[in-house]
């Protein structure tokens, strides 16, 4: 992975303007598309498979007038007056008439109409006008809402409007978010001591979140998207976008201060720090996509949107950022004697830095440190046990808004439960006395404990359903309301048996309770799945069992602390006024979102810190010095990254939406605790106690897991091999003690352009050697350069420069003709290789076979002409070998590896066929012939030296 990222970084650096323009065009396309499609977010929470949602769906089909969007105009009489006073009553009737004339209004029910029920408060100070709208909440346009609100202007009585349609679902930024970005910029400037270096992470992050915002707006045009989704994606995209770029720029600046070439430094920074970024980002994505397992659509969209933001941040860090580094070039090199330059020198010399002093203090008292951290964080987690979950309603709207004012007026005048009534649907298809049965059902519902009032049953036009509005005594977000819903559902069975009318409990409040229950039940499975997958990924990254387990268990303390502080502030009300909020239940999906995001981000710091420790342990084998040195190298940049994330998240708390505030506070606290207390304090303490056991991994697991090379060991080897390859002069192929798989054979050879080389070994070893030179099999050791491609790190390039030819034709089907073989190879050959030979048609095939016959005759390799219709398998061994070897030249590669079948060709025949191959391929092509031991006798002595040491054969054969 590190080598691949190194190449990506190098290409992006060299083609900086192309990469930058591509990203800017992508940003313009995303934002333009999102705005053009006009997507709007919404707060339509739904949860398929629950009783409340199924009842709503049934209501929408059978009683659309009751299932559509609705609003309430709340009229408050002036002080000392009553809504029943003639003047106020006339004004209410006039208001109802004005409302009924608005486009998009289906019906209006005034408080004094014949079928009105409970729309005037007991003290007659407040009245409600019910407004039924056409379509769902998402389908009601702003023009209709503005017209509704305008009807309340210039009246003697105060008029406020309530209803889900008035909830603010716009996505906007406030001054506090801008301040958060400015504080992040200040941290970057202090970290780098350079405006240019500090600006690059901000640029990549802002471009990334712009693309994400455009994508989410476009998505909102075709499917429901919660208003929290873009805010969550924005918050996470900014945080990880800045952090990921920070790690790479920090590595780049350190390398520049130590004298590395800027282009090479950018590529190396992307290959090393970028590897940690990629795998840290993958853990975040895994955690966020884990929200899909919960099975709640709006939550799945939030998870996918946030995961997309992380993916874009990763892509920006490894492509856009090196392009910016390329544009700035050598101007980013710290001046000699500057703070950045001195810091880089101190790190190289293992000087006493703040990070080194801190970790030494932790390592001196690991037991005391562990106990202290667990006790403190455990105490902060205590409020989590009183967690109360619910969905937002009118009471969570901003203070002073018309929907919040109306909600408070209804709750105060009619009772808290009236502000969020339950809907009870009754199937009346089997009843014969509808009105009496509805009265009986109403009476039974009113007798349920906790019910304040029940409206008269209203049958649907087709007499399939009837609905009752049930107002609990308590508010929608009161825990007692959950008990009322449960008791209503328990009572439904008895009512059904008495009246033959199945009942369902639904409505916004019931849906919210069902969602909260589903989310609470999903927390443990979600945590197990996400933690399990991430532990497996970290096991592959760190090659350890205990380190990933330690990281996952520490995460539980992080989540507990984040949730505990959020409960204390938003549920208990501690310091709520400082954050411009009020005490109430916690947003029902906040804990699972917090778990997903915090887990991913917590693993970020684990990867960034522990990968440095792993790198030092691999280099030195000393676990204590690995902890100290690895921590010292990563502490400064992790500190800066954590501070940036903290300030970005904290910026959404004071003036953010009520939906996002508790999430933002939980994330800000969780990030600070995780980075500074868990990863930088508890982590080194536990690693010290574990010692060498921290890096234990069973051999079976080690063999089964892929080598992800986060530490960049393979990249270091690759760079060393590139330097070695540059020292090989004009050699086309050089193999330096390549250890072949599944054998003890070691291959060493050197060939100039036009050389012929013989590999002398048994058939199996020859094939292994050919596949290794062509990059298809990795060598167990050694190094090689094949036509400019370094092995083993550039196996893909090597495979395009080498053609493997089995001149025995053992793998051909019996029915393959010579013409089919040539046409197939011509069709697959690169365009440059086909130049002058025509396309893969019959005429070009015949011409090529004629040329082959001419060359074979000239070099004494002919045993008769070969026609296009001849079956290859039926040709004599010599003719078949000639044809197959010649066909191998059609690939146009600079190296041919040809394997001669044991005993099928005499040395003189190999010489003759080789001359034909050289004539077809060109004098500069290297031909590597694989022959059996003893078959080299009599070969042309002009051949270059080939040396194959094969301990299985216990022989060394060399020839010239």
PLM regions: where:
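Conserved ABC transporter NBD signature motif
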Residues: 779-791, 798
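GG-anchored amphipathic helix commonly corresponding to the ABC/SMC/Rad50 NBD signature/C-loop
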Residues: 865-868, 877-897
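Structured non-transmembrane domains adjacent to transmembrane bundles in polytopic membrane proteins
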Residues: 49-70, 79-163, 386-572
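Conserved N-terminal strand/loop that marks the beginning of ABC ATPase nucleotide-binding domains
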Residues: 727-742
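Glycine-rich P-loop/Walker A and Walker A-like loops and their local beta1-loop-alpha1 context
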Residues: 743, 753-778
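Q-loop/switch helix immediately C-terminal to the Walker
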Residues: 808, 813-859, 884
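Membrane-embedded transmembrane helical bundles of large multi-pass transporters/channels
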Residues: 1-39, 105, 136-389, 500, ...
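Conserved catalytic loops of ABC-family nucleotide-binding domains
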Residues: 283, 892, 904-940
